[in-house]
Amino acid sequence: LIQDSLSAFGLKVESITDRTAENAAALLQSGHILVALMGKGSLTNNGHFIIIAQIKENGNVYIADPANYENSTKEWDLQLLMDELKQVYDYGGPLWAVSAD
């Protein structure tokens, strides 16, 4: 779903198997955005998608959370988000890197 949908708009999408905070930070620093399927935790009780869009110098990130605007207005710990990725997944999830090239 994610790969096919974003590829249809000419975006490059890669399923990420190294879901460490260090790798996610490197992807963000290289200009990618991340699509993350979240499990139960700080952002959701059931699971939903967020965009991890920007990393700050302190290592925290900004997200786009369609279920809760307030979550999109504050910094988040990247390790926390990686820890709360959905554990049961398919179709290349729960983490994808997206770029324009």
Briefly describe each language-model feature range.
Residues 1-15, 93-94, 98-101:
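Cysteine-nucleophile protease catalytic domains, especially the papain-like/related folds used
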Residues 29, 33, 55-101:
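Noncatalytic regulatory segments and standalone regulatory/sensor domains
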Residues 7, 12-70:
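Active-site-adjacent substructure of cysteine-protease-like catalytic cores
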Residues 3, 21, 25, 49, ...:
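Extracytoplasmic/secreted envelope proteins and their assembly/folding machinery
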